[in-house]
Structures are given as C-alpha cells and as structure tokens.
Amino acid sequence: LDRGVYGPRHERIGGAVRALQPDWIFITGDLLNVPEGLPHLFRFLARLREAAPVFVTLGNHDHYSGVPVADYAELADRHKITLLVNQSVFVSTGRGELAIVGVDDPSLHRADLHCVPPQADHRFTLLLAHAPNILDQVKAHHAIDLILCGHSHGGQWQVPGIPTFWLPPGCNGRVAGRYE
C-alpha cells in the first residue's frame, strides 16, 4: 500500500485473486511504506484471506515504515494472517507436508535460516524471503525445495535491449526468473 490507503484498486486485486481460487497466498514483503497504512493493509490482507490462507514475510519498506514487528504480528494474528519472521509452519497437503518458512528481510541482514526444518520424507520446504540475496546464505543442508522472493521488482527499470542497469541492494545481480 504505497500511499497507505485502501481503495478500489485493492478491491479489484482482491476480486481477481479470489477468482483464481488459490490454495495459498504467499507475499514476500514490502507491504507498507507509511505507518498510517497499517489498518488499510490488514483490511486488504483480510480480503485476500477470504480466498485462501495468507502467508507473509516482511521487506525493507515494512521496516522503514517504522511500524514495530510486534504491531504487524498482533494485527496478523487478529486477522488470521500467518506472519513468518524467521519462523516455520507446517501444512498437511493430503500427499505429504508443506513446510512454509519465512525469514525477515535478507537485504537488511535480518534473515535467520535456523528456522528451516530438517529434511524429511514427504515434506516439501518452501522458503519465503523478501530479497534474493537469501540465496547467498542457503546451503545444501537446508533442504529447501523452492524459494520465492521479491525486492528486485523484475529489474526496477528496464530499457528494451539494454541489460538491467540498477537493482536494489540485496539482489546481488538477480533480476527475475529461476536461479539454482
């Protein structure tokens, strides 16, 4: 919520998400820029929650907003949104278990991978992190199957035919796409 206000655009986004009938919704931070937007943010997340369980991590702008993590956590709990700040939750899928791991923003050096559970049979481990520099911290023993990140905005600014010339700190050259 860049301007901190919930509006018709957010209703349209919520409607489009609900129409997709997702099983889960994952958001990797940069939810908020100004503290005045906090109630509007959770109104939006609650609308998304009508479609599917919502799992959220924090990004650099969430911290820059000045809102304490405890305030995010209290509102997330109240609205049944799963806020993961260096934490893991487990979801039964009927074919096994999904471990959803969320770390605090790696670009601000707040990520702690000690929350990644050990490898287990019939478990798929998904890591949610705001910045792609989390890839520099992940090791083979972490047994993570998929990492979802944001922060790079797909290259921030791009001119057709010219390689990306600026990325936010914390991307470490990763613009968009798949990295192994």
Task: Name each region found by the language model.
Residues 1-2, 97-106, 126-130:
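Active-site-proximal beta-strand elements of phosphoester/diester hydrolases
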Residues 14-19, 91-92, 111-120:
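Short amphipathic alpha-helix with an adjacent loop that forms part of the alpha/beta core around
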Residues 24, 55, 81-82, 98, ...:
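Short, Asp-centered acidic motifs that coordinate Mg2+ and/or phosphate
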Residues 31-34, 60-64, 89-91, 105-108, ...:
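Solvent-exposed loop/turn segments at secondary-structure junctions
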Residues 58, 85-87, 129:
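Short loop/edge segments at beta-strand edges and connector loops
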Residues 81-82, 88-101, 120-124, 180:
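Beta-strand-turn-beta hairpins that frame and shape the catalytic cleft
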Residues 132-180:
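Conserved beta-sheet core of the metallophosphoesterase superfamily
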